[in-house]
């Protein structure tokens, strides 16, 4: 019995505390408020403040009671706690101009601070105070001012001072004021940039160099860093603001400013001052705010070094840059998102520097994974711990467009050793294992995934963490499936806390936890509640709230996490006039009967499982989980105990700058980093020893490791002081080949998409520096299609019926399923005016592609592929015709080529409602059709196996294209559309189709594409329809072609093709061979020396031989520049025997730059030119920065590779190039890419006037040294003059000016239809043919009443010449049929008005004559005094001025007639005398008649008038009278059987100028590819 009593007593003694614990209820106090969403707490105090409406309220008892503060008279917009004086100082900003309120005693009293008065018509948008970490009296006030509008001034003219105003944000200015006396007085730190009238925004951003009490930066307490910027937002053609900036240092409160020299010629985008580093970010291109950026790092505010970046930084989140405990810089990067996407500005990549801050690298396991949102969380109280999450930017959609979850796998990982090793977040929770959809013991495929772990607001605990997320393999993440988890070991393992997501907060160092569901209905109870745990999350108790609220925040009232009191702030939308807040103060301080923990209630918890981190072992003393007490050390920070590790290990080291970690984690030399470092600058030897490891800065291990040096090769490494030193190369190696690549044509970044030999897709957003694999979920990519009208869009076709679409250059992909049809490999057809509308072609009834029932179906989508509808059966090619024409007959028109299953013919049909009800057959039988440059051209079969072409410019009216009748044009069996810009179509009509011996005629159309003339004969083509034809980009009218010079022999199969290159400068009217340079690249004369270009000229390999049709001669960006591989001689030699040539004046003069064939690429609008050997291994490239005058070699890799291709962005405006190469490795070959960055070789960016005016770096100049007229005008182009600066994102092609319009010459005209150019240069009618029926124009334009006959010439459409020759002068007008009456009315004159005018003139003449006779002759004696009157005689009657005028007229008339009479008499006498002598000497021989003399005289005068035009019109005898209709001589016109040539005979050359004349520098932009060849055959 005694024993039982003892047991009962012991049981009661043990159970009572547990009963008390279970019965414990926290004290909860509710406060109702309006519009209060943020509560702030002073550190180490019970005082809280919050903004309620426009006032400030305060609580001195941890939120149980609240009152309005005294001393603040204004309405308040914002309050914040001073981060350096969190115990007692807060600031409230006033709604009114230039006023703030500050407290230094935890809100008990407030002092009003007034900043200096603003200028007239300037309004403040608010001010912010920044304080100093060491001196409480040091303030920096930052204010933003904007110009007041006229409405502001009117409305507020009579208001009291300080009244709120409306401001105009179009012109805003930042101002910074400094105070060193606690705000009693302020002085402005004025910007050192002068604001001009174009500046829309002026920014001043200043900050103290000391950012914390533990700052390691070498600076004084009064050091202030300021960044001043002027930005112009509206820039006409420019898409980005122009920015100028200055970064300065002041130590005397702004009285003097010292600019940082390293950034004088750069655009500083922003800066960040950290504990031991200052980071400065500069913008690569001042004219493109999306250009790549450079990161500069300093630890003394004096010397800055450029950090190495593994990728291009384009959108930094400067406010998020921070420094971890090791001194490493954490650099988050955002990206530009598509306008269609909702979430923007999300961190897309995180780079982490080494401890020196100079070499950045991505989180290792995210470097080559799918691109996505990245989040990094580093709890400061858990040294070495990092939690990172990757959320992919690719989502899957089904056919109906409903989201089915994340397509690519996301992942969350943790590291406890500063990122050296990473593991997944393991779920160790056997009790809840069945509640998860995967096996939680399979950690790699079943772990906790958390997408957003915030760095801010974390409360220190002894390894106790909470988060929300889902458990799985990362392939599915549905926000509705999130649950709440808890960890007690610093995040290594987790267990389930709640089946729903919660807001949470911890107190008493993690011993008290409060959690509230986001949604009150989560637990099937509509009322709100919160849960709390007093045993570190082991058990939970529910506390019911009487009101349903939306929780806004839950927080511990002590920021250091030591207290046990909490604030829960929630709101309800029940009231129509706004939100109502319910603020709950929750007090756990009396838990466990108010018991305080004793020593035996604690245990040691070791960070990182007891391993060394930073050379130290860390531990924390924490309460045991089941202890029945609270720590109750309120306002004491969590204590971390350190024990230095005796021996240093590799974990305490990082790779030296010149080394990188390989796949095994070993630090190996990196050639590109060696080039950037200075290790080879200090030695003349071939190798230099370098230690691969360096101790991490700040590591505390005691005994360093012995690190052996590695010999680094310095052969080929550029030395300091050379430009080559500044070139940055990034190498990537692959175990596959890249078979396809294409850039997205935007200035936003340098994104490109690549497909390898395995059908895998890879994406790079930095020009190939970093390359990421696209996860297609196991599907092979079988085709890639880029949208030609929307440069950020592309579509990838998967082998299993998926289509992956991107509209943001490959950052994110949407996945949809194609219709249930067989993929036929046909390209998509896009709507030019609707991004999400396109047509897909699939095979129906195609169990086998050879099945007779298998046929194509056109499917239409209007939502980017989410849904498809069947549009037209048997359609094999469609066009959104209405979106292509300038003036379509119907904007919704669609044209389709249809091939019925039962027929071998194809038809062309159209519809205006996507073939729902409207279907119109345009042609019953066609070969094919294509669209180009606003035309649609249809090839229609004709009798005798011939073709006919029909053209439309509106989709309704079709006209037959009339080809010229010529002796060498047989059947029209094949033609190729070459180009269709500037109102004409260039077409190649094949005249010989024998494989390997193909050639034909080059034709050009009129403006509506219906009438063609021959420009050149025997132009080379290949069997695939490609033609040696290339229009020079960026310049008008310059075309290069290759002709088959022995076409007759080739057609007869007697000889192989012999090609010659010809050039035209007036769009094909005249052709010449290329003038060769005098000497080769070695200064030697060429072997052929004939002065005839027919025998010795330059020839280039053309379009038909290119491996990649995008490798054009020219670039629209590099104006006038062309590269080509060819030779000087009578004909073109084989490719391997040729050299590389270059021109800067559009092909007028050339120079040999390399003795062997090279590949070329243009950069920076021609400011940087790069050559690389073709078909031979190399380790070097050649580059030029002076427009090809001089060339330098640069070694870009350690071993030789065979370069397959060199490329850059389509606009050729970047300073980065991408090389694709293949190198021999042990056991085989490896494919490699090299990104070569030339940004740093230029001293600065050229200074450009955005209005296009000349500046110190840009001048207007003609393309060549000769000021020739081209297309009737002389043009000058804006060109860079300084080779030491780079151009950047400036569209120089937009800046040219016409000096004058020239007189028309022969070069401004071309032959009209049915006319040909004869050997003498004139246009003559083909014998047997008639000119085109001029009256046909009356049928096309019914309103015309007249027409004109052709002169045989027509003016080149591009020509703007004025005056001069008028070879196209119209004939006399003829009446249009049926318009004779209107014609007669236009040109006839009625008799009545004509008679009236004639009689009136006669009367005027008669009256004037009578008046002169009456006043001047009759009154002075009549004609009797004729012989007496002399000039100046007196005696004439002159009573007034009229008499004097009349007498002067009479005297002058008599004088003139008198002299004429004398001259006639004298001439008569002399003639008679001469005739007498002639007759005496020659007897009866007769002389020339009078009319013959007059005619001869006219001819002499005509010769004078035509002086200077002889070479312009080779035979002008027919055109002496330019005012009348020309007659076309037919004496020299050959018959159809005769032979004639289509080009002007080549003049002999006496002096061929050297290429590359001085001053011929130019740069502009081109597309990445030429127009594709389109052939109908």
From Swiss-Prot:
Compartments where found: Golgi apparatus, trans-Golgi network membrane; Prevacuolar compartment membrane
Gene Ontology CC annotation, any one: membrane
Source organism superkingdom: Eukaryota
Mapped BNR repeat ranges: 58-68, 101-111, 179-187, 414-423, 485-495, 531-541, 762-771, 859-869, 1141-1150, 1183-1192
Gene3D superfamilies registered for this protein in UniProt: 2.10.70.80, 2.120.10.10, 3.30.60.270, YVTN repeat-like/Quinoprotein amine dehydrogenase
Pfam families: Sortilin-Vps10 (PF15902), Sortilin_C (PF15901)
Glycosylation sites: 121, 168, 445, 791, 1008, 1301
Record topological domains on the Lumenal side: 22-1391
Keywords of the record: Glycoprotein, Golgi apparatus, Membrane, Protein transport, Receptor, Repeat, Signal, Transmembrane, Transmembrane helix, Transport
Transmembrane segment boundaries: 1392-1412
GO biological process: Golgi to endosome transport; Golgi to vacuole transport; protein targeting to vacuole
Span list, region Disordered: 1531-1577
Signal peptide start and end residues: 1-21
UniProt main location, coarse: Golgi
Membrane topology: Single-pass type I membrane protein
Cytoplasmic topological segments: 1413-1577
Similarity remark: Belongs to the VPS10-related sortilin family.
Function of the molecule: Functions as a sorting receptor in the Golgi compartment required for the intracellular sorting and delivery of soluble vacuolar proteins, like carboxypeptidase Y (CPY) and proteinase A. Executes multiple rounds of sorting by cycling between the late Golgi and a prevacuolar endosome-like compartment. Binds the Golgi-modified P2 form of CPY, and this interaction is dependent on the presence of an intact CPY vacuolar protein sorting signal.
Protein name per its UniProtKB record: Vacuolar protein sorting/targeting protein PEP1
């Amino acid at each position: 019995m005694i024993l039982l009593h003892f047991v009962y007593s012991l049981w009661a003694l043990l159970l009572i505390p547990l009963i008390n614990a279970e019965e414990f209820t926290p004290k909860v106090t509710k406060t109702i408020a309006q519009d209060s969403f943020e509560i702030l707490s002073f550190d180490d105090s019970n005082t809280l403040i919050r903004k309620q409406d426009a006032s400030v309220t305060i609580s001195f008892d941890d939120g149980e009671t609240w009152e309005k503060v005294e001393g603040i008279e204004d309405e308040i917009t914002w309050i914040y706690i001073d981060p350096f004086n969190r115990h007692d100082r807060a600031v409230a900003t006033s709604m009114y101009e230039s006023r703030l309120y500050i407290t230094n005693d935890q809100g008990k009293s407030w002092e009003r601070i007034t900043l200096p008065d603003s200028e007239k018509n300037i309004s403040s948008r608010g001010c912010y105070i920044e304080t100093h970490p060491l001196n409480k009296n040091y303030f920096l006030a930052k204010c933003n001012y904007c110009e007041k509008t006229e409405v502001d001034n009117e409305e507020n003219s009579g208001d009291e001072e300080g009244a709120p105003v409306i401001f105009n944000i179009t012109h805003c200015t930042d101002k910074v004021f400094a105070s060193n006396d606690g705000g009693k007085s302020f002085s402005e730190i004025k910007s050192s940039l002068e604001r001009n009238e174009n500046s829309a925004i002026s920014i001043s951003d200043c900050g103290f160099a000391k950012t914390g009490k533990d700052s390691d930066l070498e600076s004084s307490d009064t050091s202030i860093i300021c960044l001043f910027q002027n930005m112009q937002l509206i820039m006409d053609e420019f898409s980005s603001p122009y920015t100028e900036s200055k970064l300065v240092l002041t130590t005397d409160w702004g009285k003097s400013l010292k600019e940082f020299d390293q950034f004088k010629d750069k655009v500083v985008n922003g800066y960040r001052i950290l504990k031991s580093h200052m980071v400065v970010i500069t913008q690569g291109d001042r004219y493109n705010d999306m250009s790549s950026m450079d990161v500069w790092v300093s630890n003394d505010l004096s010397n800055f070094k450029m950090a190495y970046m593994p990728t291009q930084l384009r959108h930094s989140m400067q406010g998020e840059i921070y420094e971890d405990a090791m001194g490493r810089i954490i650099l988050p990067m955002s990206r530009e998102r598509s306008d269609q996407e909702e979430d923007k500005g999300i961190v897309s990549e995180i780079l982490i520097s080494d401890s020196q801050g100079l070499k950045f690298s991505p989180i290792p396991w995210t470097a080559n994974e799918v691109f996505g949102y990245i989040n990094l969380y580093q709890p400061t109280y858990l040294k070495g711990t990092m939690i990172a999450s990757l959320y992919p930017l690719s989502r899957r959609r089904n056919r109906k467009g409903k989201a089915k979850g994340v397509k690519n796998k996301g992942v969350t990982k943790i590291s406890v050793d500063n990122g050296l090793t990473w593991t997944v977040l393991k779920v160790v929770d056997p009790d809840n294992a069945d509640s998860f959809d995967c096996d939680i013991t399979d950690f790699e495929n079943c772990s906790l995934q958390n997408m957003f772990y915030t760095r801010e607001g974390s409360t220190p605990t002894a390894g106790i963490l909470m988060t929300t997320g889902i458990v799985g393999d990362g392939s599915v993440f549905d926000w509705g499936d999130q649950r709440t988890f808890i960890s007690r070991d610093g995040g290594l393992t987790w267990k389930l806390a709640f089946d729903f997501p919660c807001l949470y907060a911890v107190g008493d160092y993690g011993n008290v936890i409060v959690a509230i569901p986001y949604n009150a209905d989560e637990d099937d109870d509509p009322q709100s509640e919160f849960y709390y745990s007093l045993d570190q999350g082991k058990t939970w108790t529910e506390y019911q709230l009487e009101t349903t609220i939306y929780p806004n925040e839950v927080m511990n009232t002590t920021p250091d996490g030591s207290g046990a009191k909490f604030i829960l702030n929630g709101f309800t939308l029940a009231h129509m006039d706004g939100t109502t807040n319910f603020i709950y103060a929750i007090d756990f301080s009396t838990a466990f009967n108010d018991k305080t923990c004793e020593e035996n209630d604690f245990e040691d918890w070791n960070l990182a499982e007891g391993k060394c981190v930073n050379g130290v072992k860390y531990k924390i003393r924490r309460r045991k989980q089941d202890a029945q007490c609270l720590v109750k050390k309120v306002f004491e920070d969590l204590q971390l105990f350190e024990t230095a590790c005796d021996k240093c290990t590799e974990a305490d080291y990082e790779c030296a700058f010149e080394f990188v970690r390989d796949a095994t984690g070993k630090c190996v030399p990196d050639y590109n980093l060696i080039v950037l470092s200075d290790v080879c600058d200090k030695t003349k030897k071939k190798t230099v020893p370098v230690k691969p490891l360096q101790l991490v800065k700040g590591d505390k291990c005691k005994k360093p490791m012995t690190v052996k040096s590695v010999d680094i090769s310095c052969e080929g490494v550029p030395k300091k002081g050379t430009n080559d030193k500044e070139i940055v190369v990034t190498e990537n190696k692959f175990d596959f080949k890249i078979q396809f690549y294409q850039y997205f044509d935007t200035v936003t970044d340098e994104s490109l998409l690549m497909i390898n030999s395995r059908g895998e897709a890879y994406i790079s957003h930095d020009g190939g520096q970093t390359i990421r694999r696209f996860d297609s979920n196991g599907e092979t990519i079988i085709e890639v299609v880029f949208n030609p009208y929307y440069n950020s869009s592309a579509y990838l076709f998967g082998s299993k019926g998926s289509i992956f679409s991107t509209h943001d250059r490959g950052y994110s992909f949407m996945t949809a399923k194609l219709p249930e049809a067989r993929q036929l490999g046909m390209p998509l057809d896009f709507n030019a005016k609707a991004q999400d509308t396109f047509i897909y072609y699939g095979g129906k009834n195609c169990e086998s592609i050879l099945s007779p029932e298998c046929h194509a179906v056109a499917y239409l989508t209007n939502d980017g592929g989410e849904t498809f509808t069947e549009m037209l059966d048997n359609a094999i090619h469609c066009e959104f015709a209405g979106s292509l024409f300038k003036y379509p007959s119907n904007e919704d028109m669609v044209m389709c080529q249809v091939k019925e299953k039962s027929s071998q013919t194809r038809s062309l049909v159209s519809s205006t409602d996507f073939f729902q009800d409207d279907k119109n057959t345009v042609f019953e039988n066609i070969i094919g059709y294509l669209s180009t440059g606003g035309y649609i051209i249809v090839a229609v079969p004709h009798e005798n196996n011939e073709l006919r072409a029909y053209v439309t410019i509106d989709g309704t009216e079709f006209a037959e294209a009339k080809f010229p009748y010529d002796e060498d044009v047989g059947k029209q069996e094949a033609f190729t559309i070459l180009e269709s810009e500037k109102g004409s179509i260039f077409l190649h009509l094949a005249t010989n189709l024998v494989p390997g011996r193909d050639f034909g005629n080059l034709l050009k159309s009129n403006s509506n594409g219906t009438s063609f003339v021959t420009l050149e004969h025997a132009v080379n083509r290949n069997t695939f329809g490609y033609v040696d034809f290339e229009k020079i980009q960026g310049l008008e009218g310059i075309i290069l072609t290759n002709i088959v010079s022995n076409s007759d022999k080739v057609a007869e199969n007697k000889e192989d093709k012999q090609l010659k290159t010809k050039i035209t400068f007036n769009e094909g009217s005249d052709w010449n061979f290329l003038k060769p340079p005098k000497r080769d690249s070695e200064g030697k004369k060429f072997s052929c020396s004939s002065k005839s270009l027919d025998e010795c000229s330059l020839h280039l390999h053309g379009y038909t031989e290119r491996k990649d049709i995008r490798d054009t001669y020219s670039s629209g960006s590099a104006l006038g520049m062309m590269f080509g591989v060819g030779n000087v001689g009578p004909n073109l030699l084989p490719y391997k025997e040729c050299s590389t040539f270059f021109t800067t004046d559009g092909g007028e003069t050339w120079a040999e730059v390399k003795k062997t064939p090279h590949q070329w690429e243009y950069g920076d609008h021609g400011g940087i030119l790069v050559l690389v050997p073709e078909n031979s291994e190399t380790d070097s490239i050649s580059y030029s920065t002076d427009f090809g005058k001089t060339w330098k070699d640069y070694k870009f890799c350690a071993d030789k590779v065979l370069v397959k291709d060199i490329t850059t962005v389509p606009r050729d405006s970047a300073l980065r190039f991408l090389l694709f190469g293949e190198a021999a490795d042990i056991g085989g070959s490896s494919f490699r890419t090299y990104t070569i960055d030339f940004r740093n070789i230029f001293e600065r960016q050229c200074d450009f006037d955005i209005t296009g005016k000349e500046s110190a770096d840009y001048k207007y100049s003609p393309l060549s040294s000769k000021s020739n007229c081209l297309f009737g005008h002389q043009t000058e182009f804006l060109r860079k003059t300084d080779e030491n600066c780079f151009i950047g994102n400036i569209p120089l092609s937009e800046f040219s000016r016409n000096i004058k319009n020239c007189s028309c010459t022969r070069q401004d005209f071309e032959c009209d239809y049915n006319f040909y150019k004869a050997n003498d240069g004139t246009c003559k009618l083909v014998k047997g043919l008639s000119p085109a029926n001029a009256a046909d124009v009356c049928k096309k334009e019914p309103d015309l009443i007249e027409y004109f006959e052709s002169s045989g010439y027509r003016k080149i459409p591009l020509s703007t010449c004025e005056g001069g020759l008028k070879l196209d002068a119209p004939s006399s007008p003829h009446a249009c049929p049926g318009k004779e009456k209107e014609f007669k009315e236009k040109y006839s004159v009625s008799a009545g008005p004509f008679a009236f005018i004639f009689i009136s003139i006669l009367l005027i003449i008669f009256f004037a004559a009578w008046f002169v006779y009456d006043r001047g002759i009759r009154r002075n004696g009549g004609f009797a005094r004729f012989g007496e009157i002399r000039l100046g005689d007196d005696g004439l009657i002159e009573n007034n001025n009229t008499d004097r005028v009349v007498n002067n007229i009479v005297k002058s008339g008599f004088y003139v007639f008198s002299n004429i009479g004398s001259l006639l008499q004298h001439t008569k006498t002399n003639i008679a005398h001469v005739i007498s002598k002639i007759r005496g000497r020659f007897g009866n021989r007769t002389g020339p008649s009078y009319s013959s003399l007059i005619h001869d005289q006219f001819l002499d005068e005509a010769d004078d008038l035509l002086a200077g035009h002889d070479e312009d019109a080779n035979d002008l005898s027919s055109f002496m009278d330019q005012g009348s209709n020309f007659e076309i001589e037919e004496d020299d016109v050959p018959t159809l059987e005769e032979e004639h040539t289509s080009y002007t005979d080549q003049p002999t050359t006496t002096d061929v100028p050297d290429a590359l004349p001085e001053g011929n520098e130019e740069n502009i932009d081109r597309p990445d590819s030429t127009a594709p060849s389109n052939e109908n055959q």
